[in-house]
Amino acid sequence: HSEGTFSNDYSKYLETQRAQDFVQWLMNSXXXXXXXXHADGTYTSDVSAYLQDQAAKDFITWLKSGQPKQE
């Protein structure tokens, strides 16, 4: 069943790649909208960017694990 293993690994790779592309697209979309920031909103913007990065990393880790989402 080596062909099945390769197909499964390749499918997981493609899913991970699509997820990373999607997250990158989301981050680029959000960054373009927040281009006009005020000085008092800089800290909030930086925290939001950090949280978005962390959420993206957690999401990709979850996708790679192949585990069902826990509710």
From Swiss-Prot:
Q: Where in the cell is it found?
A: Secreted
- What upregulates or represses it? Produced in the A cells of the islets of Langerhans in response to a drop in blood sugar concentration.
**Major localization listed first in the record, in broad terms:** secreted
What SMART domains does the entry give? Answer: GLUCA
Q: What is the lineage of its organism?
A: Eukaryota, Metazoa, Chordata, Craniata, Vertebrata
Extra remark beyond the main annotation: X's in the sequence were included by homology with other fish sequences.
Q: Which GO terms describe its cellular component?
A: extracellular region
A Pfam family in this protein? Hormone_2
What PROSITE patterns does the database record attribute to this sequence?
A: GLUCAGON (PS00260)
Q: Name one GO biological process term.
A: response to starvation
Annotated protein name in UniProt:
Pro-glucagon
- Identify the keywords attached in UniProt to this record, alphabetized: Hormone, Secreted
The record lists the organism as Piaractus mesopotamicus
**What family name appears in the similarity comment?**
Belongs to the glucagon family.
Q: Which molecular function term from Gene Ontology is one that the record holds?
A: glucagon receptor binding
* Superkingdom field: Eukaryota
Q: Report if keyword Secreted is assigned.
A: yes
Query: Does the keyword Transmembrane feature in the UniProt annotation?
Result: no
